[in-house]
């Protein structure tokens, strides 16, 4: 029989092993033959009188008394070792000891034969295959048995006999298991064979796909079968429990003697039943473990050994306890049953835990496939049923039939070669793949945005027009369209679901005439439908009620726009706390906070719910209460107000805390009360004398119904406010939160210049709500002159407001606003207007030149500028014009700061301001008569003609002294002298100055003074007519400029500051206390505010506009004037500034000796240190700290450079001194030769003249004594000063001749020279920051461009060069593209003219 069975089924077994169906496939193929064989053997045993096997469920009850001997203790020990024998790690377990009886031998032979039929070796691939042991057959057959047990009429004794026979069979049967150690290798061999036998590569690929597909599908089906087995196990446990209870009831009904006789039998039956259950549980656990091991083998993870054999599970101990209690009383059966139930649950829990661990392990190949098919992962311990199993099976079939399996298999093949590393589908490429279309994205956010294209979700909503967008970036781009009309409305970047649109109405819908601005969604409460104006007034004071027991409306309703504006007007006069959403309203946050605090102070009424039970009901209620028509709402509001007033007059009595009124009635009264209370005057002022002022109609009520409420209602309100049972602070808030009603216009009392109400609110929202005191707040009255009290904001422009009144509503085709376009009246613009009149266009936003359709009027206006070349937006700093306002804003980033806080460079002669130091240098050369590299027109074009308006406090210091860099200092007046400028505090004020590039990052923290102070100071510096000591200095302006340029700050090409002589960055002070001058008084004040206001006296201008060397060394071209030094007592005690100037005005013979005095003076000036507390004490704390940090950083970088500079300066001085001595010796030698020639001639002519000539020559050879330092004698001009002739090269622009050139060769092609010198030069970087500007950086304004061509075009904006000329109209353009756009206008005009001529000819 074995050979026939093996021969018949060997081919089927080999095929199923190849395709991975190792266990369940064999079971399916061998299940029916094995059952038939077992039934035959059972019938034979029944005829022989032996114990029937498990399948003989209908055996007679007498079989229980058949000669089946009881098992010996040896057999019990073998039963205890049974888990070891059936372990999956043993290929051939030990064979149990055979029974002594013939029946036991027959059962054993039967088991051996059945086992032998189930175990086969794969001769093709020599792999050990784990077959289904007889235990698993018993599990399946027992399931069939138990399924029929409720309907079976077999007595309990029969079942006991069957169970006993079954236990003997399993106890004596050797169980043989064959582990699936290398199933994956077997599949790999099949794949190798398929590849080797394949005809082409495509066939091999198709075979591999089919193999993988079958393997994954079978794996999922095996997992589903495992679920089914678990469900069957739970059903068996329930049936066994019911059977135990049934047996207990029948045993209790029997007599006591019979109970004693059958006690051992019942105990034995129960013991055998538990043993049977134990075997079934072991089979299930073995199945789970085999599945887990197969899973681990596929994953390449070494499988852990089986648990310790010495460990005995709880059910084994329970079995021994039942055996020991077999001789005891019959009452032990109940305890054994309970222990059995507990053991079943525990063993079932162990199997479930193993299954969960198997499910949680990562699968490298097809893990997501199983998870996508089995989508419902319920908790297994939950009670299940057959219906749930059918539902799960149907779900699996439906999911597998939808193509998801094939799609995921394609993904698996993409990662099939990466399955060994354990990553697989967790890689980023697969992680961000769209399940709809298969696209792969680089991040999760990009995938989410893409999924919105499939779902149609647009979560970002524009709070102005209501348009929706999929991303926040698209919303930002769209919101720029509203920036011009709504500059103060912030963008709402929070995603708003579409079902919440009713709570977030757009601003344009609120302003449209169809819906009143005061209309808003009604709060979802159990109130009757209130009016819209009542709702707008309800939120600020809804938190108070007439009784503390009623909290009123909870603060969950979002206030509409109109309410926020009202709150801003009210709270602006009381508190200054900012609001998070409307920072322009300083009092809005305080008002809302006060309202919130009041709502929190009120006790909570728990007797009744104040809102709907679910969000859907809330939305339904709100949708039901939304106003349909404004006229209907007005009528309802009027009726509601009158009814509320009548009820209030009838019921508004003193309300003690004990009285309980319906909450609906209280809420209606509250709504009416909140409409009334108005003025924040003391409560006593309105209690008796002016009751009518306590209640004012609302905005909407005053618009349509001028009549006021009855006086009885006002009296009631006054009495209520003054009642002792009501809290006073509640009345105060009720009256104080309504002040804004006096300052808001209504639709009826809008001024005549405002015909459209929505434009009025758009113009004034939300910045210009000014706060007024209570004394000037007029009381609202129905009179028509109420609009006269509407406050005007400081930024309100009546002309602009009137123009805005004619602007059409959004989405309208009204073109009347085009009359107010600010366009220069050029010929091209007029031609375009004529073309627009003559040409028929189909779309109002269509271009008449190129027929392009734009999105809006503003886009069309900007598009026309591309044709006309107009640039209406001009930068006031550099004079550059732009076509759009956005480009101008982007350009302002080049200047680093806002125009009002800009620190300009000013000419000390004519006070003209320039934004760039290079242009100021060229401008100064115009005053000194030196040649310039820029033309006067170019210099004039770069001039800042319109200085920015003053927005700083007028009492502050000079802006150029406050915003200066920390290198310089500003000397103040002496002990009794006046300060240096009008409007400026006196004293040794250490202001600082910096160039454009160095102080750009610091100007945001600086406070600048009034621009007029700058002009006053500059004029005082130049009003030197009353100073007799300054006469010689005015005659030497050239010498003054030359000296300034000689002592300027040297900067290396790398951007590192290189300072002359012993100059240090922090020691550039001109404090009179550190100069050592005789006029510097040590008692000079040290604070800017320590001196009185200066007066205009001639003494204050007694000094020259000469700055110290330290001041001139702050920047290359920083010539901003400072405050004047203290007045000098006499010419003998002249300051070092005068002595430095006097060097160049002395004869050459005295220059050498004077240089010896000047060098120590310069060193004294440059070595004087600036105290940190004095140098920057005038600056704000944040700027002071920043300057100190910059100062320390600069000191560390300049440590090595200063030493090298000192050595270089010393070497330079020695060279200058040697050159001066050499020139002096040459001069003496030439004079000696001339004297000798004259002497020889005189000897020949007159002998008497020889002695006189010799005496004269002797006088010439004798050296002259050195002059005093205080002398100011002026001699004839001699050779140039060697200090000037041997100056070192300038470091800011190495190729640019900053100083006057010696020859005229450098003056050719001035524009080319400045372009060549500026572009490759290193930028001006006094802070020695890291280089951030490349070779495409403009050397004038330091703006970086992407390429050299863009930089070349940019330089034309500075030079005003327009090389591209139009041949028709001779108009110049900076770029060729602009010229092409301009030529389109001529082409269209010529085409129309030719068409007109052709028509005329015809």
Curated annotation (Swiss-Prot):
SMART domains in the record: ZnF_C2H2 (SM00355)
Biased composition (Low complexity): 57-69, 532-547, 1067-1122, 1234-1261
Domain of life: Eukaryota
Segments of skewed composition (Basic and acidic residues): 32-42, 594-608, 631-650, 1223-1233
Keyword Nucleotide-binding in record: no
Similarity comment: Belongs to the sal C2H2-type zinc-finger protein family.
Cited function: Required for the establishment of the posterior-most head and the anterior-most tail segments of the embryo. Probably function as a transcriptional regulator. Could repress the transcription of the tsh gene.
Protein name in UniProt: Homeotic protein spalt-major
Originating organism: Drosophila virilis (Fruit fly)
Lineage: Eukaryota, Metazoa, Ecdysozoa, Arthropoda, Hexapoda
Gene name of the record: salm
